[in-house]
Amino acid sequence: MKKFISLMLSAVILAGASACSANQSTNSEASQSSADTTAASTAGQATEAKKDYSEEQKQLENSLKQMNFSGVVRITENGETICEVALGKKDSSTGEEIKPGTQFCVGSVSKQFTAASIMLLQEEGRLSVDDKLEKYFPGYKYGKDLTVKNLLSMRSGIAEFYDADYIDNVYTELPAGELSKTVTNGATVEQNQKALESWLLEQPLTFKPDSTFTYSNSNYFLLARIVEIVSGKKYNAFVRESFFEPLGMKSSTFIDDVDWKNLPNLAKPTVDAKTVYVGITMGLGDIISNADDMDVWLTSLRTNKLISAKSVDAMIADYSPEDDLVYGYGLIPDGMGGAFHYGYFTTYHAMAYIHPEKKLNLFAVTNDDAHAEGDFTQLCHYVIQHILDK
């Protein structure tokens, strides 16, 4: 990832500015110079406020059409939509088209909500990222060695519980090994979550805590459990009450709270995923949303509406400087002041991006597995780079 960011940085054109000064012979000349400077500054501000992104819009739309893209991409600057594309079919059986407000599963983009939940609880004095896990999971063998921060930054060594495999031409994530005997399609949400937690807390660590980075969904499932333990609420209820409702995110929900495949406004997966286990995506890949709601959410992060600037800064910091891979808390810093995360769930792929200083948000999502992360997401990074260079 750092190699990718380095390549991105090499594409940035740095412009220098020179200044000159001149002696003023009279007060009136000084006054005129000041007026000219003010006028030029005002004109410059007006020009900056009216940046033209029509080329970026055209490039984005044409490229996505060439990909036969099915989904939505929206880029906003300071609350104004500057690029937006909605293409493809919401439901191939009916021919209904995707619209900007269509809902999608966002996969691991959900992790930033879990991280934000932890940061909110820390701000309220109800936990600390430096807390040892033994505080929340008494009797856990490695509870004295691991912290909440290790989970957030993917530096815990806790084993990944997913086995990735292709089943019926769908990339499906299955419970690993012995876990598949207790986490099943026939179980309830609570039964699967209890079985998963027990399994995770019995596994040996895959590396010494905080010695390296390894992406593991298990970290964020356990973080969601910590949110439940500390708040006394179900994780979904906590996120809904803390974020969805205050922000008016009425098109956002959780796959375990609804009959998600039959949501009327959901872009249907292009291939039916036959093995989606209830409960086990909690905190790591369980949110359904749309471009409207996600832009509101990303703006709230940028503007510190619900959590502080200190917390957001912690989320977009790099906790693995010794590694080629970069990770913060539920977000991946891009090395240029922004941060993003990808998401994957059955045939859905998503990307969310913020740049606090430039006041930029991007949300991109597809319901078609043909458009993997190396496809439309690279295009999104490219367009964002063009916008940042303006």
Located regions from the model:
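Short active-site loop at a secondary-structure junction
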Residues: 67-71, 94-150, 207-216, 282-285, ...
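Short, solvent-exposed turn/loop segments enriched in Gly/Ser/Thr/Pro and often Arg
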Residues: 81, 133, 139-140, 255-262
